[in-house]
Curated annotation (Swiss-Prot):
Keywords (A to Z) from UniProt: Capsid protein, Cleavage on pair of basic residues, Disulfide bond, Eukaryotic host gene expression shutoff by virus, Eukaryotic host transcription shutoff by virus, Fusion of virus membrane with host endosomal membrane, Fusion of virus membrane with host membrane, Glycoprotein, Host cell membrane, Host cytoplasm, Host gene expression shutoff by virus, Host membrane, Host nucleus, Host-virus interaction, Hydrolase, Lipoprotein, Membrane, Palmitate, Phosphoprotein, Protease, RNA-binding, Serine protease, T=4 icosahedral capsid protein, Transmembrane, Transmembrane helix, Viral attachment to host cell, Viral penetration into host cytoplasm, Virion, Virus entry into host cell
Cytoplasmic side: 710-744, 1240-1242
Region Transient transmembrane before p62-6K protein processing, annotated ranges: 717-737
Protein name, per record: Structural polyprotein
Region named Ribosome-binding: 98-112
Site (Involved in dimerization of the capsid protein) location in chain: 186, 219
Length: 1242
């Protein structure tokens, strides 16, 4: 257990101490004299033995030497070969000592693993991992530790574990777990465990009962799994284990057919005698020796949890070894026999058929159905033979080749497998199922109504299994044994009258009993006599019609069918394993051709060419999901509008894709007017049209007003000449329209007059036009370009505190950057980026619901009497007694009465076999927690994938820093108060409460778990009167509400959730919802700051934007020239929100330049760049991006995309200034003329 010391010197042979010599030695015992030749041979033998490397053999017992007839000559080397020494004794093979790594793991396991004691023996183990003690739930007993035994353990039945927190004194001395499990070998108590293909396996025979709870360790002594059980798979044993995934969530991996490795022995009962279930007593011993007693033993232990062990022991007969484990499963059905039952359609009419169809199940994918019949397959009358089938030929059992069997729907089916009462076939779609066989010239068939459909997997409706594609979860029927949870109910057959046992002998009715059988008879001549006989018996009746004889068959079971009469008295039940059970598997589904994608400005065009109907779903990643869902059946083209918030589309079985729009354009915001108009029209068509219409209206109004004013001025000028007859208007006056021959005061005189008489009016007259012009121009300038100037104040400024607080958007992948400033220290760069966010609500499982199965036991037929119903604890149990259903001496019951015969029909509901893999869980959702995984960098410290709670209270240690995040600005969740989880999808659905389900709707079958006994059902089950003369139990029932809900459930939450939420399970959560913002507060330690004297001082900064593409992911490149006091590193940051800098810091020389990348949404970015303690402003022009649609979100805000370029503003000023000139000139001319006329009149 402990490491051995290492020798640092050559090993030496041990030195023997000097032997002790007695001063008075005893006298030697007398020994017989050996001849000299014998002494020489003995010396030679000893010499050869000493030369060998093997251990010396013990000396033979002393005795007289062997007598020889002739003295042997002197030994020679050749003779030495003939006289070989006796073979040396073999060394006892010692186990190799474990290596250092193994010894370390063994010591860790022994110190942290505690036995669980039950009745004085070890029943399993409990281990202490990560501050908790884990105990297998199936292991009964008490932990052999006083402190751990006093802990109150919590049960986690889904993981088959019990767990509890260890005392504080033991928390520092516990094992640690890990989720890293690379393929290879790991350490276990019994040796190496191989991990490959996500499975832990050991050689067969290693480990077994009593090893449940032992941990599996890696080379560092960390726990990678806890063993719960195992199952033999050929030469290796697959282990059932509990592991942890990358997120620290417990995961249970249980191979099919695994058995818990608890050492406790379960006891069974037979005639008030208890015995181990795997060792039945010698009286029944096994089925071959005592069939009836064995069946009785199984029936009495029907509800035992070790029924499988008892059944396995009864079939194997203990001492008898089977060839393979699979044979045990096949030989189980030797306990049963075929039977004849009612068939609704035998090809011509209703009949009692030897291959009646009991049930058809089509819950698997790819058109595979499972058919249960009254015939048996894979068995002959004398044993197991997969090439044969057996059926009841009248009263006897007959076997024929399986090649005579056929199954068809709308076309012949392909036989996949068969065993027992079951057939597994892959059939084409159809409305009926027919099973039949040929027995020489006889042809037997049975047809029932059942709709068979090809159920595709995924989001594509293909009709045939593809050769290649993508693997998706699906349902299949297994071809091998499943030992738990799926049984077919059996019972000993009822009595059926047999006319062949009755005959007339000496005018009396004689009952002939077959050898080794028993016959029950019932005679009425005229007194009623009945009894059981095992030998021939002669009655007093004279007519065969007066007697009935029943052959008692208590050596075989038959299926508990509603088409067979039930046996008399208390009929016990047995059960056998269903050979083909539904399981979760992986199926290959088709993959539709990739769509041809075409990008335009804010438009995504998909050219789709499906081979079969394919589902296309889309949703917006903003606050309004606006989901769409359509099946595409033929080649088509669809268009979708894409915004900066993003769009997600899913085509068929392809994974979802997300795209985002970029602010691209066709024109040039820095070009000629028509290019500017084209650019803005492509981006903002409505705004551009309104702006152009406004400009045109201004121009038209300006021109009309100017012309009107000029015409008005001209009229004022020429009016005096119009009043004078034959007046000649001078040509110059006609042209200028304002010159008159009379003299008047000019403008200077008028201004002089106003200055001398009314100075206030002088200043008003002079300044009002100028003020109006300035006000108009300023209003226009503020309207078009002052918006960005206002928004420039938004952004994260450097924090001048040791504790930095800020608010960052709740968007995964968008980093928050800032410079944390502290007096006397150089600024420290801070970056926080969300890697993952999770909204985890608290849930309460109300119930699970699934498809139900109607169980119809064999009816009770009472001849010449009445029976009554008794209540039974079955869900939706129905019982009813019908009278007068069998005619006189009818073949099924052979009653002597007519109207007095009665039948008691029963029916109830239970879970279908598919419930274990196909069920929905109804949860109530309450307020939960928000968690985030962040990457944080401050200074030279970088911390990856730190998990924090977004609640504003719980601090997280990030190195030496303390971080507090939250709470979210919006208390929002995509989950309603009630959700339904089905498979890997989640649905918001208002389900009924437990115990209030309605027939035909969701929740018509409810239970707390998939195996609990608290089953509630409401299926509107009604029993109907059976048809006279036919043993059957007709009933009506509402269709399954679970199946109806599956058809009408709509789109899952993953396709309709807003804000781009991704819904996941285990636990139920919403990931990466881009909603609201997150406050952050971080305390940065002093060690992250550097004295300002130790950092470079930067001066003479000059920034030039060399290349810039706005609205693109870091599409801007700028170069900064500088001079530095010394070489070193400086953080760079832009405190404004105009640009986001990609680099966090730069390396500076004493002089030179450096280049950085930035991302911006402004076409004229002007942002402040801070380098160490200095700052510089970077300005430039940006061109639009070429890509309209990209597959990554923007790394900047979109607050500045509406800004007008400087070039566009210049053209606008020219346009507005040109049109205003006409108005100004007209106003000036009008004003001058008005003044002239005013002064002329006065």
């Amino acid at each position: 257990m402990f490491p051995y010391p290492t020798l640092n010197y050559p090993p030496m042979a041990p030195i023997n101490p000097m032997a002790y010599r007695d001063p008075n030695p005893p006298r030697r015992r007398w020994r017989p004299f050996r001849p000299p030749l014998a002494a020489q041979i003995e010396d030679l033998r000893r010499s050869i033995a000493n030369l060998t490397l093997k251990q010396r053999a013990p000396n033979p017992p002393a005795g007289p030497p062997a007598k020889r007839k002739k003295p042997a000559p002197k030994p020679k080397p050749a003779q030495a070969k003939k006289k070989r020494p006796p073979p040396p004794a073999k060394k006892q093979k010692r186990k190799p000592k474990p290596g250092k790594r193994q010894r370390m793991c063994m010591k860790l396991e022994s110190d942290k693993t505690f036995p669980i004691m039950l009745n004085g023996q070890v029943n399993g183990y409990a281990c202490v991992v990560g501050g908790r003690v884990f105990k297998p739930l199936h292991v009964e007993g008490r932990i052999d530790n006083e402190q751990l035994a006093a802990i109150k353990l919590k049960k986690a039945s889904i993981y088959d574990l019990e767990y509890g927190d260890v005392p504080q004194c033991m928390k520092s001395d516990t094992l640690q777990y890990t989720s890293d499990k690379p393929p290879g070998f790991y350490n276990w108590h019994h040796g190496a465990v191989q991990y490959e293909n996500n499975r832990f396996t050991v050689p067969r025979g290693v480990g077994g009962k009593g090893d449940s709870g032992r941990p599996i360790l890696d080379n560092k002594g960390r726990v990678v799994a806890i063993v719960l059980g195992g199952v033999n798979e050929g030469s290796r044993t697959a282990l059932s284990v509990v592991t942890w995934n990358q997120k620290g969530v417990t995961v249970k991996d249980t191979p099919e057919g695994s058995e818990p490795w608890s050492l406790a022995t379960v006891m069974c009962v037979l005639a008030n005698i208890t015995f181990p279930c795997d060792q039945p007593p010698c009286m029944p011993c096994c089925y071959e020796k005592n069939p009836h007693e064995t069946l009785t033993m199984l029936e009495q232990n029907y509800d035992s949890r070790a029924y499988d062990q008892l059944l396995d022991a009864a079939v194997k007969c203990n001492a008898r070894r089977t060839r393979r484990d699979l044979d045990t499963h096949f030989t189980q059905y030797k306990l049963a026999r075929p039977y004849i039952a009612d068939c609704p359609n035998c090809g011509h009419s209703r009949c009692d058929s030897p291959i009646a169809i009991e049930e058809v199940r089509g819950d698997a994918h790819a058109g595979v159905i499972r058919i249960q019949t009254s015939a048996m397959f894979g068995l002959k009358t004398d044993g197991v033979d997969l090439a044969y089938m057996s059926f009841m030929n009248g009263k006897t059992q007959k076997s024929i080749k399986i090649d005579n069997l056929h199954v068809r729907t709308s076309a012949p089916c392909s036989l996949v497998s068969h065993h027992g009462y079951y057939i597994l076939a892959q059939c084409p779609p159809g409305d009926t199922v027919t099973v039949g066989f040929h027995d020489g010239p006889n042809r037997h068939t049975c047809t029932v109504a059942h709709k068979v459909e090809f159920r595709p997997v995924g989001r594509e409706k293909y009709r045939h299994p593809p050769e290649h594609g993508v693997e998706l979860p699906c349902n299949r029927y297994t071809h091998k044994r499943a030992d738990q949870g799926h049984y077919v109910e059996m019972h000993q057959p009822g009595l059926v009258a047999d006319h062949s046992l009755l005959s007339i002998h000496s005018a009396k009715v004689k009952i002939t009993v077959p050898s080794g059988a028993q016959v029950k008879y019932y005679c009425k001549c005229p007194d009623v006599r009945e009894g059981i006989t095992s030998s021939d018996h002669t009655t007093t009746c004279t007519d065969v019609k007066q007697c009935r004889a029943y052959l008692i068959d208590n050596k075989k079971w038959v299926y508990n069918s509603g088409r067979l009469p039930r046996g008399e008295g208390d009929t016990f039940k047995g059960k056998l394993h269903v050979p083909f059970v539904p399981v979760k598997a992986k199926c290959i589904a088709t993959l539709a051709p990739e769509p041809l994608v075409e990008h335009k400005h804010r438009t995504l065009i998909l050219h789709l060419h499906p081979d079969h109907p394919t589902l296309l779903t889309t949703r917006s990643l903003g606050s309004d999901a606006n989901p769409t869902r359509q099946w595409i059946e033929r080649p088509t083209t669809v268009n979708f509008t894409v915004t900066g918030e993003g769009l997600e589309y899913t085509w068929g079985n392809h994974p979802p894709k997300r795209v985002w729009a970029q602010e691209s354009g066709e024109g040039n915001p820095h070009g000629w007017p028509h290019e500017v108009v084209v650019y803005y029209y492509n981006r903002y068509p409505l705004t551009t049209i309104i702006g152009l219409c406004t400009c045109v209206a201004i121009i038209m109004v300006s021109c009309v007003t100017s012309v009107w004013l000029l015409c008005r001025t001209r009229n004022l000028c020429i009016t005096p000449y119009k009043l004078a007859p034959n007046a000649q208007v001078p040509i110059l006056l006609a042209l200028l329209c304002c010159i008159k021959p009379t003299r008047a005061d000019d403008t200077l005189q008028v201004l002089n007059y106003l200055w001398n008489n009314n100075q206030n009016f002088f200043w008003m007259q002079t300044l009002i036009p100028l003020a109006a012009l300035i006000v108009c121009m300023r209003m226009l300038r503020c309207l078009f370009c002052c918006g960005p100037a206002f928004l420039l104040v938004c952004g994260a400024l450097g924090a001048a505190a040791y504790e930095h607080t800020a608010v960052m958007p709740n968007k995964v992948g968008i980093p928050y950057k800032a410079l944390v400033e502290r007096p006397g220290y150089a600024p420290v760069h801070l970056q926080i980026q969300l890697v993952n966010t999770r909204i985890i609500p608290s849930t309460n499982l109300e119930y699970i619901t699934c498809k139900y199965k109607t169980k119809v036991p064999s009816p009770v037929v009472k001849c010449c009497g009445a029976t009554q119903c008794t209540s039974k604890p079955h869900p939706d149990y129905q019982c009813q007694v019908f009278t007068g259903v069998y005619p006189f001496m009818w073949g099924g019951a052979y009653c002597f009465c007519d109207t007095e015969n009665t039948q008691m029909s029963e029916a109830y509901v239970e879970r279908s076999e598919e419930c274990s893999i196909d069920h929905a869980k109804a949860y109530k959702v309450h307020t939960g927690t928000v968690q985030a995984m962040v990457n944080i960098t401050y200074g030279s410290v970088s911390w990856r994938s730190a998990d924090v709670y977004v609640n504003g209270e719980t601090p997280a240690k990030i190195g030496d820093a303390k971080l507090i995040i939250g709470p979210l600005s919006s208390a929002w969740s995509p989950f309603d108060n009630k959700v339904v989880v089905y498979g890997h999808e989640v649905y918001n659905y208002d389900f009924p409460e437990y115990g209030t389900g309605k027939a035909g709707s969701f929740g018509d079958l409810q239970s707390r778990t998939s195996t609990s006994n608290d089953l509630y059902a409401n299926t509107n089950l009604k029993l109907q009167r059976p048809q006279a003369g036919i043993v059957h139990t007709p009933f009506t029932q509402a269709p399954s509400g679970f199946e109806r809900w599956k058809r009408d459930k709509g789109a899952p939450l993953n396709d309709v959730a807003p804000f781009g939420c991704s819904i996941a399970l285990e636990p139920l959560r919403a990931e990466n919802c881009a909603v609201g913002s997150i406050p952050i507060s971080i305390d940065i330690p002093d060690a992250a700051f550097t004295r300002i004297s130790e950092t470079p001082t930067v001066s003479d900064l000059e920034c030039k934007i060399t290349e810039c593409t706005y609205a693109s992911d870091f599409g801007g490149i700028a170069t900064v020239a500088y001079k530095s006091s010394k070489a070193g590193n400086c953080p760079i940051h832009s405190p404004s929100g105009v640009a986001v800098i990609k680099e966090n810091d730069v390396t500076l020389a004493e002089s030179g330049s450096f280049t950085f990348h930035f991302s911006t949404a402004n076409i004229h970015p002007a942002f402040k760049l801070q380098v160490c303690t200095s700052a510089v402003t970077c300005k430039g022009d940006c061109k639009p991006p070429k890509d309209h649609i990209v597959d990554y979100p923007a790394q900047h805000t979109e607050s500045f995309t509406s800004a007008i370029s400087a070039t566009a503003w210049s053209w606008l000023k020219v346009l507005v200034g040109g049109t205003s000139a006409f108005i100004v000139l007209g106003l000036i001319a009008t004003a001058v003329v008005a003044l002239v006329l005013f002064f002329h009149r006065h």
